[in-house]
Regions:
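Active-site-proximal segments of metal-dependent phosphoesterases and phosphodiesterases across multiple
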Residues: 216-221
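Polar, low-complexity loop segments and adjacent catalytic/binding residues used for recognizing
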Residues: 202
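His/Asp/Glu-rich, glycine-adjacent segments
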Residues: 2-196, 205-212
Length: 221
């Protein structure tokens, strides 16, 4: 109401994108100015930090910024989310001014590229999926460059016309990428290595995107 406009749930103009080059204050990165500032209550992770007098380490990860930020709360040590412009995971200056070395190394492995060279296909023969609708439904969203919404999906062919690195958020490989980040986070941050409870929040986003694009009874979901 004070601004006279709608606001994004995690927007915060006082903080900036932090990537492998450090703090990015250029206005072209304003969509990465994110924090939990707009959350008006505490979270379970905040209460854990208070209970342990900040000894607990709390980190949130997700493809979506809001999926990483809000579950990990106001007092999180870090929240990392996906940058669809280059396939890297980033954060904001709310948490830090430079990425940890383990995350820079993870980004440099370009796992999103290798996953986007794959083909999205069913695990079982498609006729085994008897509790979903037909594969080619008129209600399903089509990827650009593909005439029908049917398996298989050649991601290497589709990525150029469908947002390049952004495509991975709309296919199961996005969940695979996040799982790889989860494993790297546990190791890189030494989570769970002492008597104090740590908390890693994980929000898988690709399932949500696939549901929106194809429907809850689709073969894809």
């Amino acid at each position: 109401r004070e601004l006279g406009r709608s606001i994004y749930c995690a927007e915060d103009s006082t903080v900036f994108l932090v990537d492998h080059l450090g703090v990015q204050k250029d206005k072209k990165f304003k969509n990465f100015s994110r924090s939990p500032k707009n959350n008006l209550t505490t979270t379970i992770t905040d209460e854990l930090k208070l209970f342990t007098n900040q000894r607990s380490k709390v980190i949130g990860v997700s493809l979506k910024d809001r999926g990483a930020i809000f579950p990990s709360g106001h007092l999180a040590n870090a929240a990392y989310w996906y940058n669809p412009n280059n396939g890297h995971f980033v954060t904001s200056s709310y948490y830090m001014n430079k990425l940890p070395q383990w995350l820079i190394k993870f980004n440099n492995k370009k796992k999103s590229d290798s996953l986007l060279n794959q083909t999205w296909k069913t695990l079982l023969p498609i006729e085994k999926y008897i509790h979903s609708e037909i594969d080619d439904s008129s209600f399903e969203k089509k990827f650009k460059g593909k005439q029908l919404s049917i398996f298989p999906y050649d991601l290497k062919t589709l990525r150029k016309e469908n947002g390049n690195y952004k495509l991975i958020t709309h296919v199961p490989q996005g969940n695979t990428l996040l799982t790889e980040l989860v494993k790297a986070t546990i190791k890189g941050e030494n989570l769970g290595r002492n008597e104090t409870t740590d908390f890693l929040t994980i929000s898988y986003s690709s399932t949500d995107y696939v549901g929106h694009n194809f429907g809850i009874r689709s073969k894809e979901l």
